[in-house]
UniProtKB/Swiss-Prot annotation:
Its EC number is 2.7.7.56. This is Ribonuclease PH. It catalyses: tRNA(n+1) + phosphate = tRNA(n) + a ribonucleoside 5'-diphosphate. HAMAP family: RNase_PH (MF_00564). It is an enzyme of class 2 (transferase). InterPro entries: ExoRNase_PH_dom1 (IPR001247), ExoRNase_PH_dom2 (IPR015847), ExoRNase_PH_dom2_sf (IPR036345), PNPase/RNase_PH_dom_sf (IPR027408), Ribosomal_Su5_D2-typ_SF (IPR020568), RNase_PH (IPR050080), RNase_PH_bac-type (IPR002381), RNase_PH_CS (IPR018336). Phosphate binds at residues 86, 124-126. The keyword Transferase applies. Phosphorolytic 3'-5' exoribonuclease that plays an important role in tRNA 3'-end maturation. Removes nucleotide residues following the 3'-CCA terminus of tRNAs; can also add nucleotides to the ends of RNA molecules by using nucleoside diphosphates as substrates, but this may not be physiologically important. Probably plays a role in initiation of 16S rRNA degradation (leading to ribosome degradation) during starvation. Belongs to the RNase PH family. Homohexameric ring arranged as a trimer of dimers. The gene is rph. The keyword Chloroplast does not apply. GO terms for molecular function: 3'-5'-RNA exonuclease activity; tRNA binding; tRNA nucleotidyltransferase activity.
Length: 255
């Protein structure tokens, strides 16, 4: 048994509450164990200067943590006057991941602003942010469709993320909490689509090297978790999930 009593390939309890923020076009409050993140998607009717006139949309993300999201208080980055390298990396990861499953041509010249605010951190904040932000983004697109500002849902697949690692006592484990992450010999963040395609693989041998065989098992374990996360996304999105399935079939030619 792991630190919190889970099996090696078991996710922490996951819950998504949609429409959590009333002003945002799309919003989700996601909890993954004791990690809690508010994800919102806001629509801006313009694109960055480098994209003007191209007819395509854009998706970008911001990520932040409350000072007491962690055990010891952190100074707000706004007080420091600059973002940390970690924050910039996570913001780019979230935006990159979401863009991978959206047809930006069908979005038109609009920008989707994703905001992921961690209110409590216990490991896996970036993967929880991606998983929740995806749902918030789809909800925002649905609102645009209701308002006749989009003709169709521009999303062509599901998207979710989780962590895997090699624990010195338990071996390969899924969805690391903070204590597990701190002692892991190897840890990875994996982002995948509903079709089982990889969007991002971030892996590091913190205290040890790892073999190709272990890498394959890590990826297989991540896929187990991501399939479960996508099932939760489906339940949260309801009928919108069926529209995404249709889009995926059309894109792959499996109609």
């Amino acid at each position: 048994m792991r630190i919190d009593g889970r099996e090696n390939k078991q996710l922490r309890p996951v819950h998504m509450e949609k429409h959590f923020i009333k002003h945002a076009e799309g919003s989700v409050f996601i909890t993954v164990g004791d990690t809690k993140v508010i994800c919102t998607a806001s629509i801006d009717d313009k694109v960055p200067p480098f994209m003007r006139g191209g007819g395509k949309g854009w998706i970008t993300a911001e990520y932040a943590m409350l000072p007491r999201a962690t055990e010891q208080r952190n100074v707000r980055e706004s007080s420091k006057g600059k973002l940390s390298g970690r924050t910039m990396e996570i913001q780019r990861l979230i935006g990159r991941a979401l863009r991978s499953v959206v047809n930006l041509d069908k979005l038109g010249e609009k920008t989707v602003w994703i905001d992921c605010d961690v209110i409590q951190a216990d490991g896996g904040t970036r993967t929880a942010s991606i998983t929740g932000a995806y749902v918030a983004m789809v909800l925002a697109f649905a609102k645009l469709m209701e308002e006749k500002k989009l003709d169709e849902l521009p999303v062509n697949d599901f998207l979710a993320a989780t962590s895997v690692g090699i624990d010195p006592e338990h071996g390969i484990i899924l969805d690391l909490n903070y204590a597990e992450d701190a002692r892991a010999e190897v840890d990875m963040n994996i982002v995948m689509t509903g079709a089982g395609r990889f969007v991002e693989i971030q892996g590091t041998g913190e205290e040890a090297t790892f073999s190709r065989e272990q890498l394959n098992e890590l990826l297989d374990t991540a896929e187990v978790g991501i399939r479960q996360l996508i099932d939760i996304q489906r339940k949260t999105l309801g009928e919108l999930a069926m529209q995404i399935d249709i889009k995926r079939s059309e894109e792959s030619g499996d109609t």
